[in-house]
Amino acid sequence: IDLMLGIPSEDAKRSYDFMRPLFRDKQSLESFDFPVEYMFKDVPQFSSLGDRIKYTLDEMDKYNIEKALIGVSLSDDVAQSALRQHPDRFLASCGTEPNNGMEDVRNIVRLHEEFDLKAVGAFPAGCVPQVPINDKRFYPIYAKCCELDIPIFVCVGVPGPRIPMACQHVELIDEVMWFFPDLKFVMRHG
């Protein structure tokens, strides 16, 4: 089971627009389509790809990936289709933006009801403004994950994009787990 698989997007550059306000260096602002392109050379382009779901399934088969956790949102028709057409291969997760408050909690509930959400993901350094792992804006999300008995996958440590990392210090997890001992907290990229 792959716990972070993405179905290729038609416009990969647009996929990262949410964090562009955090970029300061010239390469990230002007040159890169992919925010961590400085680490990964020859990033594949998928703009002319036909059936994105079939392509993803073929790649999963090629690498013997039986199932994959994919991100779904209320506006992502491709991920929704993949989950509906291939429930035996794809499992739903959703990203969260704690700056949106209770709107995000309602979104988690709706996606859980509609797609049997298996996890929530968070990228604290990618939030605008950034939100530390132990910030109170995350608490309603942590509580909802406990209530739904699903894990939260949180990016911790140094982020790949050239943005500040203080909000993702692993030490911040300690306080979260003290307040939420039932929370299934998974460190991603840690």
Enumerate the predicted regions with their spans.
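Active-site neighborhood of phospho(di)ester-bond hydrolases with catalytic His/Asp-centered motifs
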Residues: I1-L3, I70-G71, S93-C94, G121, ...
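An N-terminally biased module of ancient metal coordination in phosphate/nucleic-acid-related enzymes
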Residues: I1-L69
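Conserved, mostly hydrophobic/aromatic
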Residues: M4, M60, L111, C145, ...
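Histidine-centered active-site/metal-ligand motif
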Residues: M4-G6, H86, C155, H189
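Histidine/acidic-residue-rich catalytic or RNA/ligand-binding cores of hydrolases
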Residues: A12-K13, P164-L172
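A structural motif corresponding to the C-terminal end of an alpha-helix
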Residues: D58-E66, H86, E147-L148, F179-F185
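Active-site gating/metal-coordination segments in enzymes
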Residues: E66-K67, S73-Q168
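Structural recognition of alpha->loop->beta junctions
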Residues: E113-A119, V170-F185
